[in-house]
Amino acid sequence: MSRVAKKPIALPSGVNVTINGNNVALKGPKGQLSYDLHADVEVSQEGNTLQLAPRNGDASKYAMAGTMRALVNNMVVGVSQGFERKLELVGVGYRAQAQGKTLNLTLGFSHPVAYPVPEGITIETPSQTEILVKGVDKQVVGQVAAEIRAFRPPEPYKGKGVKYANEQIIRKEAKKK
C-alpha cells in the first residue's frame, strides 16, 4: 500500500486549486499548470490541503495514486517557487549567450548552435559558461536542460562539454604506450 499517496499535499498561500472531475488546475505567483489525473485516482480538497486516494483498494491503484500525488506536489512547488536547473560549459572557447527566445551556444563545432527556448521556460546566462534554465513545470525544465546538455555531453578524458552543475564526471585515464 502506498505511503506516498496517504500524505496530504499542503497548499501554500497564494496557490489556488480548481478541481474539475479528474482535472486539477493550479494557479500561483509563478504561473499556472493543469493536469488530467488517472481515472483510478480521485482528488479532494480539505481546507488548504489536497488529498489523493485510489477509487478502490487494489495495490496497483495505490501505486498510481502515489505517482499522481508526486506529480501534483511538483505542480504545487512549481507554481509557488518554480524550478531551476543549472548547467556549466567546460572547455576552451565554449560559450553560451541568451538572446530573447534563443540560446546561442558555441561548443567547438564548425557552426554555432541556436536552441529555440520553449514556451514557459526562461533561460539566463549569468556568465558565458553558465546556463540557468527556469520554469514552472519540473518535467519541461529537466527536458530542456537535457536537450542543451545533449549538444555536447561531457567526455570522460578531459571533462569537456555541457554538464549539470552538481554532476560528477567519471574520468578515464589516457591510453599508455
From Swiss-Prot:
S-S bonds: none
Keywords, in A-Z order: Ribonucleoprotein, Ribosomal protein, RNA-binding, rRNA-binding
GO terms of molecular function: rRNA binding; structural constituent of ribosome
Superkingdom, taxonomy of origin: Bacteria
Subunit structure: Part of the 50S ribosomal subunit.
GO biological process: cytoplasmic translation
General function of this protein: This protein binds to the 23S rRNA, and is important in its secondary structure. It is located near the subunit interface in the base of the L7/L12 stalk, and near the tRNA binding site of the peptidyltransferase center.
Gene3D superfamilies: Ribosomal protein L6, alpha-beta domain (3.90.930.12)
Name of the protein described by the UniProt record: Large ribosomal subunit protein uL6
Keyword Ubl conjugation: no
A GO term from the CC aspect: cytosolic large ribosomal subunit
Classification via PROSITE patterns: RIBOSOMAL_L6_1
Family classification: Belongs to the universal ribosomal protein uL6 family.
Keyword Secreted listed: no
Organism whose genome encodes this protein: Thioalkalivibrio sulfidiphilus (strain HL-EbGR7)
